[in-house]
Amino acid sequence: MYQNVYFDGRSIHLWDDKLGYRKTPYKRYAYLYDKGGKFTALDGTRLKKVFRYDKEDENLYESDVIATTRTLVDQYTDSDEPSVGHRTMIFDIEVEVTEGFPSPSKAENKITAIALWDSVTDEYYCYILDPENKLEIESENRVLKKGNNTIIGFKSEIEMLNAFLGKYCEIRPTIITGWNTDNFDIPYLYNRVYQLLGQEFAGLLSPIGVVKYSEYRQRFEIAGVSSLDYLALYKKFTPSLKPSYRLDAVGEDEVGIKKVSYEGTLNELYENDRKKFVAYNLNDVHIVVELDKKLDYIETSRGICHIGHVSYEDIYASSRYLEGAILVYCKKIDVVVPNKNKDARKLMAQRAREDKFAGAYVQEPQKGRHEWVFDLDITSMYPSVIRSLNISPETKIGKVVGWDSKEFIKKDNKKTYTIEVGGKDKGKLTESELKEYFEKTNVSISSNGILYRMDKVGLIPAILGKWSDDRVQFRKLAKQFNDDGNEKKFQYFNRRQYLQKILLNSLYGVLGLPVFRFYDIDNAEATTLTGQELIKFSKKITNHYYNKELGTDEDYVIYIDTDSIFASATPLVKARHKGIDTNAEVIMTQHILNIANEIQNYLNQSYDLFAKRFLNLDKHYFEIKQEVIAKSSLFITKKRYGMKIINEDGRKVNKTLVKGLDTVRSSFAKGMKTLLSEVLEDLLANVPKEQIDKRIFKFKKGMKAMDYDDIASPTGVKRLGKFIKNVDERNFQVMDKNIGGKLITTYYMKASPVHVKASLAYNDMIEYYGKKKYPKIVGGEKIKWVYLKQNPLSLAVLAYKGNEDPPEILQYIKEYIDVDKLYNQALKKKIKMFYDAMGYGLPVDERYTLQRFF
């Protein structure tokens, strides 16, 4: 199986785990219509294979498959097993900072250290520029070995780079990674080596001497070596936004390892404590090593890419690996697929400007606290819709314009329907004629009126079916080997089932992506709108179940989100078991499990009716399952709620599930998140409002004594330069104070976001204090910011980075932070959302009420 693939414009360079390295001329080919051709297109057209063709010919098939994917699909059609024999190198470089953050493209500053880890030997190395021998290494060759750490000091940077390249060529990694390596370490290292040692030495990073900047990927491409930046992988596979993506924060959060702490700048650490500097460099690598041991993102990425038959760097583009997987499937069944839409890029830009296609249905919740809530989730709803309706490019027949299924089934419906095929009017049918068409023709109809033939399984449904079946099989095998105690095989099959899950949940999302080969906005909306109708139908049937038993006419569904409905079992439990103690957790849980199971079965039986009446289907894949029971829940608004879960998938648990609340949001201050979490727990536990008010005002009173870092607002900086104005332009604000003969001035537009103002103020203060050795804040960074009280520089807000900040700026924040404004602008509004949902008034400080006298 392939380890790496590279296309140089003429030849394919392929690294195979058994056959080694091969270079072969690339022969492009495509398919064209030929009445007697031996190949068949997805739409049934007969085709012939051609090696010479006009790239602009609109009748071509598969002419636009990229060379690397074409090669991998053709050579490895029968296998999607990940290759073996890989050697991963995790590395990190440290660079001297003179003025501002070092530019990777210019690479003007010295590299002071390079640390690396070799996956085969489990050895760590640190190559450090140490001309004065401050490390006090006594051996003649300046090598110090401690356990699996080897530290080597050098008198010059050129010496150090030569030695590192020697070790790199000795290791000859197939995969390299680190934290932000694509944007900093790799380009800086390559450009620095190029400047000091020349092209030949810089090319040593590649086994064939080819390192080029890829405009498509916006980073360097090293032929024969896969660069998988762990920061990028972490962002791709971690579902929730993090308050900070700094290695320090992620390391502490995920594996309990922080960066080595130091005072001042990294330059000062290098000059004053070189041993600690080495520890800092090695520790950065160690954190990434431990992250991958826990998260396994490199193997996950490789597994996905092998299923898709694409290079590992394509892991970030789901449309690439999904398309590759479909191409492999089609090749196995001897089907040729069409070219992509030539206007895909224009459509992508247009989509970015306009609203996206219809998405999921989310119902505004019945706000407030609800007891004994259970959920019911439709299993793999979108894949199930696609498979049930047979949604695929080649199965799409046409469209019923203005289709409304509820209107269609009404007895007095006299509407005439227009039928479109290929966007053209093909005639009109009365309601009775359309009914007759449905009865006599094996077609389905989606909620947006798209007609699909059902006589043959479509390409997309067939692939989803295969992936679903594969996942079921892998899960069975994983369980079997886990029960047998075979850890190695359990891990293998558990990963394989996880990969299938990723593919299943990704495919429907790219149907509405113009760059996807099988893009069709009708098919995308057929999926989402039918999903909407299905979940709304589920609500209607659930309410029917409640109202029939209780003799009422009420809405018992508290909330709907995409494929899930939430309802309280309390009304049914109380009606069936008069006088029951609803605080009796064990008894209540059993009653609720029984009720949820009843409604689950009732809904699953009703889906036959839904499929036939609304979609013209005799069979379907719709199924709903109960997952969690919450003793109490608090619903605030759409996508924002908290639940005290006591049962999950039939197992007893005790945890708080939070969705969308500021207790888990990355842009909310750490200390304030803690308070909000406590308030949420109190509300879920039905703690009296007076006690919660006490907690809130105790926190407010204590804010002045808190560390500013706990109450500062974290955020990412975007488009910083966009808001800066020249002094002679209109519509700007000026903060201008001449203090001690120095001038601090920031010009920004009135509409500037508060974090931009805070960042610009920080950058000006670096100039003001003459601290040019500290890098300024730039776009893309994560920062924290605070409001300030009246201060000598008249700054309203001020930011800081959280690492390598001038002590003068941090002291300024400590002295002038406005905790009252932070409370009022940030925390008070969030608490009000909670209290509004409960029907409470604002928190009351009992110290200022008459109640304290009684």
Predicted regions and their residues:
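DnaQ-like (DEDDh/DEDDy) 3′-5′ exonuclease domain used for proofreading
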Residues: 1-172, 283, 287-310, 315-362, ...
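Conserved catalytic palm subdomain of right-hand nucleotidyl-transferase polymerases, strongest
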Residues: 91, 228-229, 368-381, 468-474
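Active-site-proximal helix-loop-helix substrate-binding element of RNase H-like nuclease domains
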Residues: 124-126, 133-138, 146-151, 172, ...
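Proline-aspartate-enriched helix->loop->beta-strand connector
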Residues: 164-188
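Active-site palm subdomain of RNA-directed nucleic acid polymerases
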Residues: 259, 535-562
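Common nucleic-acid-contacting/processivity interface regions adjacent to the catalytic cores
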Residues: 268-406, 411, 486-541, 559, ...
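Catalytic palm subdomain of template-directed nucleic-acid polymerases
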Residues: 565-598
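C-terminal, non-catalytic extensions of nucleic-acid polymerases
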Residues: 596-854
